[in-house]
């Protein structure tokens, strides 16, 4: 088995799917099951572990915002925006953890209950419809400074639901922000930055509660394959972050929304067809 090639494929899948409204966990899960023959729990743990590449991409792309956050953390920033972003991330991350950890512990037990892969496709379809409707029915104009505590808690709850396989973290978080009236570019940006603490927490929880599965996943691909997948995911992610934010700044937001919604829906259908459940 060519682990280098598999690492490249998994890296591309992770790098693309993390930023558009298709669940990166689900896509990596399907590829891992198809190419590597991993068990559901091992493949799911591997999908979360692979987010190292997308975390690196977000840190690199938003390095100025991260620098501002660090200054705000030690009260050395003179920008109100840095403190607002820090408040946003702290609250969202806490709520995400309270929602996501119990859901993760539930998910890793699902194979015992016989969860069919078709459920993943159905959840993706629902996710795509929510994303489409949220953008169709609202004209968002808010920025970070307009968000109230209740709004931030809602975003945290939405991001926590992404612990479920089939739910797109970026999709559901961006949709929640736009439903709350946040401008598309700002919604994408906040969603992408909030990935960093959420994904770090997800990796920590995965290693803590699924050490055996993580070990199996790493050995199934080999260390070199894993490293290559992370590097590829990082570069692909940077490209997609830049492309989505640039597109969100244009007057073609409706086109972007329709494309993302269609991708989410088609992805769910193809996922089911690929596994023979439709």
Swiss-Prot record:
Membrane topology note: Multi-pass membrane protein
Highest taxon above the source species: Archaea
Molecular function per GO: undecaprenyl-diphosphatase activity
Presence of the UniProt keyword Secreted in the record: no
Location within or outside the cell: Cell membrane
UniProt catalytic activity: di-trans,octa-cis-undecaprenyl diphosphate + H2O = di-trans,octa-cis-undecaprenyl phosphate + phosphate + H(+)
Keywords carried by this UniProt record: Cell membrane, Hydrolase, Membrane, Transmembrane, Transmembrane helix
The protein's Enzyme Commission number: 3.6.1.27
Transmembrane segments: 3-23, 42-62, 88-108, 112-132, 152-172, 190-210, 225-245, 253-273
Keyword Mitochondrion appears in the UniProt entry: no
GO cellular component, as recorded: plasma membrane
Coiled coil: none
Pfam families linked to this entry: BacA
Biological function: Catalyzes the dephosphorylation of undecaprenyl diphosphate (UPP).
Family: Belongs to the UppP family.
UniProt name for this protein: Undecaprenyl-diphosphatase
Gene from which the chain derives: uppP
